[in-house]
Amino acid sequence: MWKTVVVCFAMLVRAGTCFAAGSAAADLTDTETRWLKGAWPVIAFAKSQAIPLDIVVQPQSAPGIAPISLAYISGRCKLVLSMRGNVEARATLERIEPDLLAATLELMAAHELGHCRRYLDGAWNGLPAGFVAAALPDDINPALRLSYSDMKATRREEGYADLVALAWTQQHHPSLYPRVHAWLLAERSKDLIPGSHHDTLVWVQLAKDATTLVQSSTFASSTALWAAGLALDN
């Protein structure tokens, strides 16, 4: 199942290999090359917008890690591929219908770009003006309250990133939007634990109609609908 994570700094320091177009391409595996090719329209967009985005290919074995994720280090976003020794990287590609693969890989890359945008805006884990996070349930073990609060904040960020991904699809693959949306909805519904980190259904369901994401930019479209989802979620 596709789940994204925010990669820790220490992991990248231990074994991160930066990749630039035209360099070290021969060292990439076929799986890494396919993911990068699929993500490239989003990467090119980030470059055109002067978004500080680097690509990091993890050379070590990474079983059980999300194949694609994001880190934020020293003011720069890192799009991280963790695919070696990771059966999920290839399995994810094989589960997607061939004619939907390009659009779906862009969706996943755009999701990570959504995380990047929030970091660059200094808004990570923040709420829009006028919103206050719902109070924690009284019956939560005091030792778990901070973890619960962090989980809720992560869930909000995942919801925003999913909307950025869908807004990208609406703008770049409008004819495929219903199918890509259905794919994402199915992914978020698998093994769902309500209220957990990747329970973004409130936002994904709001975006079933592609016209809800028609705005001047990918990020503007996402922000408006994200706020609507926050209101429902609270």
Positions of predicted regions on the chain:
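Active-site scaffold of zinc-dependent metalloenzymes
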Residues: 67-103, 109, 113, 119
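Sec-dependent N-terminal signal peptides
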Residues: 5-13
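Post-HEXXH active-site segment of zinc metalloproteases
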Residues: 119-158
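Long, well-structured alpha-helical subdomains associated
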Residues: 147-158, 163-234
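N-terminal signal peptide c-region/cleavage motif recognized by signal peptidases
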Residues: 15-21
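Cleavable N-terminal signal peptides
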Residues: 7-8, 18, 141-143, 165
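Second-shell loop/turn segments in exported
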Residues: 27-33, 67, 92-104, 146-155
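Zn2+-dependent metallopeptidase catalytic core
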Residues: 29-54
